[in-house]
């Protein structure tokens, strides 16, 4: 890689940092540029940012291609080294060369690396042996079918100075996080002459961490016979079997940690579909769906002035989602929701607590934004306005329910007659059975109800429109599926998309190193709003929290001391938990401090630190899109 390419990579990563390519909790703490000039200057600034965005995207694509090529080169080197080591082993078996092989020992510092590396092998990722090995389950931190960290504990032993090929990706992630402390930053990091040496060093560092974290788990693996089939998710826990008083799920929904001095705010009517309105705009790092509650804390003057300017009693504002990718035909669109404030209270430090509820989906034209966009999770101090358009919600009722069967209609809602009545209806219509089933949503609702029974959720809405959004929040869909359902105007299609995910078994993965953290089957509702809820901490930062009964053994560590201050769940203390492999914050452990309170312990996983993926998914060793995204995220965060 020549100096010109290196400089271009450095420039691209700087641009990625400015644009916040991958938003994380730390990035939200950075100050955004603020422009106090008039509307004309603001529009010019936005146009300049849009142009820079297009140019930077092209540079980012070039960098992704460079990184892909780099991983391919490393993979090829691993194959060559594997072949050399195979030949070396053959020579060791030769009595004539046994003495020479015995004397050919690695340096002392490498000899001190964890003995766990003796169990690892470097195989081509697409080989049958690799696929067989990757499907097995071990107790290590990076197993459990975690993408990018396939289990290799049953592989053929290799010398300690070998770098397993399936560790290169995670080594690069950790290596990049230290780029800021190096002279020359990421450009120096990626130079060919020292890249492999530093990756090798980082692999050994990771293995030392992994060895310390999973000694107990590895001992269990040694004493058990490996299973040839992937391990299925454990049976869900039943919190009702615990002794004690069941926690009141209404308490978290009230957000009582804001205090008791909250006043009701008059409501507002739904806005007409297709209409355009100018309103106050904030940004948010998560995707909100209509019906979801958003608690936040900002300077009181922003909302108070908005009430005075609008002349209305109620307050409605827009929340945009930068993570929602705009359509290719119109890259200047930003999607979001309207939110209505329904309660507020003083915090005692010139900030006001607000509780709001998402109402309708909207689309924002970025060319119309007036003022600096600010994140609602960072206590914004300046106003930003834009014109928004209310998106429609189309719902087609089931065709058979639109047919008047005369005197037979009285049998329509009798459960014992339902199937027979349906057959009568089908014989009287020109539509085939498949066409009627395509627009039927009752069987989808019933399958979703059965799946959610294990989560102890009994607040399922009956309105199809509200139900479609509610299911997205409680069925732990992947980020791709969440975006797809949000952009869908048809409720019927939205429910069909949800139906395709009901049979999938999913895991929570660490967003930084891809370690497996928890099974989605262990989700349960600690709030009447469901398993996924937005909460606000004492600093004003909003966390999307997923509550689970348990996490995977040896997957987490702890940071700091437990505390009951500003606890989202009354009667519980919280303790920060971190990924045991990469030491990144991934959520909190909640432990009951009041006697006879059930559950005794549960965990809240932060949506900004975890991602949802299939248990069967695999990520290639080289050329991985996830690796490139993760690398860019770490680069932009470290270079800011």
UniProtKB/Swiss-Prot annotation:
PTM summary: Ubiquitinated.
Q: Where is the composition biased (Low complexity)?
A: 113-137
- What ranges does the record list as Acidic residues composition bias? 1-11
An example Gene Ontology cellular component term from the record? nucleus
Q: Which residues form the CULT domain?
A: 505-614
Xref: Pfam families: Yippee-Mis18
What quaternary structure, including any partners, is listed in this protein's UniProt entry? Answer: Likely a component of a DCX (DDB1-CUL4-X-box) protein ligase complex. May interact with pic/DDB1.
Protein name as annotated: Protein cereblon
């Amino acid at each position: 890689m020549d100096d010109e390419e290196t400089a271009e990579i450095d420039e691209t990563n700087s641009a990625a940092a400015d644009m916040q390519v991958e938003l994380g909790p730390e990035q939200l703490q950075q100050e955004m540029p603020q422009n106090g000039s008039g509307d004309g200057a603001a529009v010019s600034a936005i146009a300049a940012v849009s142009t820079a965005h297009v140019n930077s995207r092209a540079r980012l694509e070039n960098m992704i291609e460079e990184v892909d090529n780099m991983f391919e080169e490393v993979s090829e080197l691993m194959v060559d080294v594997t072949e050399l080591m195979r030949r070396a082993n053959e020579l060791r078996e030769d009595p004539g060369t046994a003495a020479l092989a015995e004397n050919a020992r690695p340096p002392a510092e490498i000899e001190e690396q964890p003995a766990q590396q003796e169990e690892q092998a470097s195989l081509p990722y697409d080989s049958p042996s690799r696929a067989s090995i990757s499907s097995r389950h071990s107790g290590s931190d990076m197993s459990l079918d975690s993408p990018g960290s396939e289990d290799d504990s049953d592989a053929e032993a290799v010398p300690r100075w070998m770098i397993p090929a399936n560790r290169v990706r995670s080594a690069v992630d950790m290596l990049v996080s230290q780029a800021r402390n190096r002279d020359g930053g990421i450009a120096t990091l990626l130079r060919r002459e020292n890249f492999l040496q530093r990756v090798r060093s980082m692999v050994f560092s990771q293995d030392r961490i992994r060895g310390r974290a999973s000694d107990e788990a590895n001992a269990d693996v040694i004493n058990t016979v490996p299973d040839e089939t992937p391990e299925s998710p454990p049976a869900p826990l039943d919190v009702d079997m615990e002794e004690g008083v069941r926690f009141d799920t209404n308490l978290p929904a009230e957000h009582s940690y804001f205090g008791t001095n909250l006043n009701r705010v008059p409501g507002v009517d739904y806005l007409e579909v297709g209409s355009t309105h100018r309103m106050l705009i904030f940004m948010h790092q998560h995707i909100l769906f209509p019906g979801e509650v958003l608690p936040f804390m900002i300077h009181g003057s922003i909302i108070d002035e908005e009430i005075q300017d609008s002349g209305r009693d109620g307050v409605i504002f827009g929340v945009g989602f930068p993570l929602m990718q705009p359509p290719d035909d119109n890259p200047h669109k930003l999607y979001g929701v309207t939110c209505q404030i329904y309660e507020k209270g003083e915090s005692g430090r010139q900030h006001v607590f607000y509780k709001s509820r998402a109402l309708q989906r909207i689309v924002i034209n970025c060319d119309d934004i007036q003022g600096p966009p600010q994140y609602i999770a960072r206590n914004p101090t300046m106003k930003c306005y834009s014109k928004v358009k209310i998106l429609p919600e189309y719902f087609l009722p089931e065709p058979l329910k639109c047919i008047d069967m005369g005197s037979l209609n009285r049998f329509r809602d009798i459960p014992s007659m339902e199937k027979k009545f349906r057959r009568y209806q089908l014989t009287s219509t020109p539509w085939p059975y498949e066409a009627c089933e395509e627009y039927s949503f009752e069987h989808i609702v019933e399958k979703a109800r059965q799946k959610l029974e294990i989560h102890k959720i009994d607040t399922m809405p009956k309105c199809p429109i509200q139900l479609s959004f509610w299911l997205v929040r409680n069925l732990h869909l992947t980020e791709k599926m969440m975006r797809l359902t949000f952009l869908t105007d048809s409720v019927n299609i939205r429910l069909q998309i949800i139906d395709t995910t009901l049979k999938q078994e999913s895991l929570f993965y660490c967003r930084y190193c891809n370690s497996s953290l928890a099974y989605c089957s262990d989700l349960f509702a600690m709030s009447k709003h469901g398993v996924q809820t937005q909460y606000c901490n004492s600093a004003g930062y909003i966390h999307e929290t997923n509550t689970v009964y348990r996490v995977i053994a040896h997957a987490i560590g702890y940071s700091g001391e437990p505390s009951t201050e500003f606890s989202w769940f009354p009667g519980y203390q919280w303790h920060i938990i971190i990924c045991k492999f990469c030491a990144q914050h991934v959520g909190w452990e909640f432990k009951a401090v009041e006697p006879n309170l059930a559950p005794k312990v549960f965990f809240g996983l932060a949506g900004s630190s975890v991602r949802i993926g299939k248990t069967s998914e695999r990520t290639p060793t080289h050329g991985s899109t996830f690796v490139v995204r993760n690398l860019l995220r770490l680069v932009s965060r470290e270079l800011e």
